[in-house]
């Protein structure tokens, strides 16, 4: 999965997919009542990027729905996965469940079209703080109470705080999550980060008792780092330059081993090295 980073304006969906992304990452900020409000990152952000592009969250979802609904004039067949980077640090811990409930309602109405031919992309809810695990339970409860438990098949989870792998595993247990797990590792492109924890995450993914289905590394803009991440066995790379990742995947060393994921590739299925 080539994951376009910080896609917060509807116009950027086309831009990133046309550069080679089959997945996008979108920031979601919340208001004081735990309603998802804007797709907005703010300052500071990655080096070389404009930090302030935004939409109202529900409007972004409508644009995203068009981009992922077959037959729509804005449809992109290859856009198959969306990571919502949930900026929950503005919330109190006890608001996490409410945030999950409200997120589910927004997605149900504006993205999944109340279960009636909505957008088809898989969704990953990426949470920066292990203490906010009740966001997941609130999200699932709401899809069930609103009559659409089947949409949980389209949703997965990620804790993005670079926590100890063992602590993340314990948190999923508390949240009742037994699958659909992506594990991120990374840092802003302005700084360097080694691949030690990525390798641990990949080892956990490939073990018989690991909780991880997929591992992705962020934010990668250089060819050399892309090669290092691929050599470490990641499933996804988040980038500001999807064309760079696509170029490396075309190199003879990687062409035989990797391909770009399509809609038929289940993002919740573990593919071991």
Curated annotation (Swiss-Prot):
Primary enzyme class: lyase
Gene Ontology BP annotations:
killing of cells of another organism; lipid catabolic process
The residues that the entry says bind Mg(2+) are: 25, 27, 85
The superkingdom listed in its UniProt entry is: Eukaryota
| Expressed in which tissues | Expressed by the venom gland.
Cofactor note text: Binds 1 Mg(2+) ion per subunit.
As cofactor, the record names: Mg(2+)
Q: Which cysteines are joined by disulfide bonds?
A: 45-51, 47-190
Glycosylation, residue list: 250
Q: Which residues does the entry assign to the active site, renumbered to this chain?
A: 5, 41
**GO molecular function (one):** metal ion binding
Q: What is its EC number?
A: 4.6.1.-
Q: Which Pfam families does the entry mention?
A: GDPD_2
Q: Which UniProt keywords apply?
A: Cytolysis, Dermonecrotic toxin, Disulfide bond, Glycoprotein, Hemolysis, Lipid degradation, Lipid metabolism, Lyase, Magnesium, Metal-binding, Secreted, Toxin
Report the catalytic activity: an N-(acyl)-sphingosylphosphocholine = an N-(acyl)-sphingosyl-1,3-cyclic phosphate + choline; an N-(acyl)-sphingosylphosphoethanolamine = an N-(acyl)-sphingosyl-1,3-cyclic phosphate + ethanolamine; a 1-acyl-sn-glycero-3-phosphocholine = a 1-acyl-sn-glycero-2,3-cyclic phosphate + choline; a 1-acyl-sn-glycero-3-phosphoethanolamine = a 1-acyl-sn-glycero-2,3-cyclic phosphate + ethanolamine
GO annotations of cellular component type: extracellular region
- InterPro entries xrefs: PLC-like_Pdiesterase_TIM-brl
Q: Where in the cell is it found?
A: Secreted
Q: Which family does it belong to?
A: Belongs to the arthropod phospholipase D family. Class II subfamily.
Function of the protein: Dermonecrotic toxins cleave the phosphodiester linkage between the phosphate and headgroup of certain phospholipids (sphingolipid and lysolipid substrates), forming an alcohol (often choline) and a cyclic phosphate. This toxin acts on sphingomyelin (SM). It may also act on ceramide phosphoethanolamine (CPE), lysophosphatidylcholine (LPC) and lysophosphatidylethanolamine (LPE), but not on lysophosphatidylserine (LPS), and lysophosphatidylglycerol (LPG). It acts by transphosphatidylation, releasing exclusively cyclic phosphate products as second products.
Q: What is this protein called?
A: Dermonecrotic toxin LdSicTox-alphaIB1ai
């Amino acid at each position: 999965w080539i994951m376009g980073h910080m896609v917060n304006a509807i116009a950027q969906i086309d831009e990133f997919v046309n550069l080679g992304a089959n997945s996008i990452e979108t920031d979601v900020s919340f208001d004081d009542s735990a309603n998802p409000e804007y797709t907005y990152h703010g300052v500071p952000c990655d080096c070389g990027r404009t930090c302030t592009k935004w939409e109202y969250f529900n409007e972004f979802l409508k644009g995203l729905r068009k981009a992922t609904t077959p037959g729509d004039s804005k449809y992109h067949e290859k856009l198959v996965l969306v990571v919502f980077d949930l900026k929950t640090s503005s919330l109190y811990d006890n608001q996490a469940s409410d945030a999950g409930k409200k997120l589910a309602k927004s997605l149900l109405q504006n993205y999944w079209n109340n279960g009636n031919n909505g957008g088809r992309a898989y969704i990953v809810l990426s949470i920066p703080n292990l203490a906010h695990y009740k966001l997941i339970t609130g999200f699932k409860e709401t899809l069930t109470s609103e009559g659409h438990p089947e949409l949980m098949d389209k949703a997965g989870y990620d804790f993005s705080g670079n926590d100890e792998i063992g602590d993340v595993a314990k948190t999923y247990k508390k949240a009742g999550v037994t699958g659909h797990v992506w594990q991120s590792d990374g840092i802003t492109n302005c700084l360097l980060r080694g691949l030690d924890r990525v390798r641990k995450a990949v080892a956990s993914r490939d073990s018989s008792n690991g909780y991880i289905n997929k591992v992705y590394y962020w934010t990668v803009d250089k060819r050399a780092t892309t090669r290092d991440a691929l050599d470490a066995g990641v499933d996804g790379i988040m980038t500001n330059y999807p064309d760079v990742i696509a170029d490396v995947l075309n190199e003879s060393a990687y062409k035989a081993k990797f391909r770009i994921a399509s809609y038929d590739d289940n993002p919740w299925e573990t593919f071991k090295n």
